[in-house]
C-alpha cells in the first residue's frame, strides 16, 4: 500500500502541472488584445464533452500547432519523469489498473459508449461529477463499480479539450475513487513479488459480474440525463 507521504507527493506533482498550465493561460491572456477578458478559474469551469469535437478546430494557425506540440512535449516529459520516480510497488499497481480498466472498457464498450454519448449532451462542473461518483461509491463497495468509474472518467478526460479542466478532474476524482475499499481490492490482487498474473487477472475480473458494471452505468446515465 502506498504511504500517505507518497500519495501527497504525487498529488503535489500533479498540482504543479495544474498550476503551470494556469500560469500559461494567464500569460497568454496578458498578451491578448482584449485585455479586459477574464479567464475563468479551473474550479468554476463547466465541462462540456462532445464526441464530435475535432482538435483541428482548435489548431487553426501555425502558432497553435507549435504551441500544442510544445505543451505536449513538456507534459509528457513531466509525466515520464514522475513515472521514473515511482517505486516498483506503485508501478505494479499501475499495471493492474491498466489491465482491469482496459478489460472493462473492452467488455462493456457498448454500455460505456452510451454513457459517453449522454455526457456529451450535458454541462456540469468537476464538483458535480465528484459528488455523484462519491454517492455511487458510498452506496456500493464492489470493485466493478470502481473500475467502471475509472474507465468512464478517463474517457471523459480524453474528450475534454481543456488540459486544465482535465487535470483538475483527474486529481479530484483520484482522491474520491481511491477509498479504503479500492485500496484493499488492489493490494489483495497485487501478488507479493509485484508481478502481474496473466491468466488469473482475467478470470478474477469475470467474477465481478455484469451487475456491478451495469449499476454504475445506470447511476451515471440517470445523473447525466437528469
Curated annotation (Swiss-Prot):
<keyword id="KW-1043">Host membrane</keyword>
<keyword id="KW-0472">Membrane</keyword>
<dbReference type="GO" id="GO:0042981">
    <property type="term" value="P:regulation of apoptotic process"/>
</dbReference>
<dbReference type="GO" id="GO:0016020">
    <property type="term" value="C:membrane"/>
</dbReference>
<dbReference type="GO" id="GO:0044193">
    <property type="term" value="C:host cell mitochondrial outer membrane"/>
</dbReference>
<keyword id="KW-1035">Host cytoplasm</keyword>
<dbReference type="InterPro" id="IPR021119">
    <property type="entry name" value="Poxvirus_F1/C10"/>
</dbReference>
<keyword id="KW-0945">Host-virus interaction</keyword>
<comment type="subunit">
    <text>Homodimer. Interacts with host pro-apoptotic protein BCL2L11 (via BH3 domain). Interacts with host NLRP1. Interacts with host BAK.</text>
</comment>
<dbReference type="GO" id="GO:0033668">
    <property type="term" value="P:symbiont-mediated suppression of host apoptosis"/>
</dbReference>
<keyword id="KW-1045">Host mitochondrion</keyword>
<keyword id="KW-1081">Inhibition of host apoptosis by viral BCL2-like protein</keyword>
<dbReference type="InterPro" id="IPR036834">
    <property type="entry name" value="Bcl-2-like_sf"/>
</dbReference>
<comment type="function">
    <text>Plays a role in evading host innate immune response by inhibiting host inflammasome activation. Interacts with and inhibits NLR-mediated interleukin-1 beta/IL1B production in infected cells. At the host mitochondria outer membrane, interacts with the BH3 domain of host BAK and prevents BAK from binding active BAX. In turn, host apoptosis is inhibited.</text>
</comment>
<protein>
    <recommendedName>
        <fullName>Apoptosis regulator OPG045</fullName>
    </recommendedName>
</protein>
<keyword id="KW-1047">Host mitochondrion outer membrane</keyword>
<dbReference type="Pfam" id="PF11099">
    <property type="entry name" value="M11L"/>
</dbReference>
<comment type="similarity">
    <text>Belongs to the orthopoxvirus OPG045 family.</text>
</comment>
<keyword id="KW-1119">Modulation of host cell apoptosis by virus</keyword>
<dbReference type="InterPro" id="IPR011207">
    <property type="entry name" value="Orthopox_F1"/>
</dbReference>
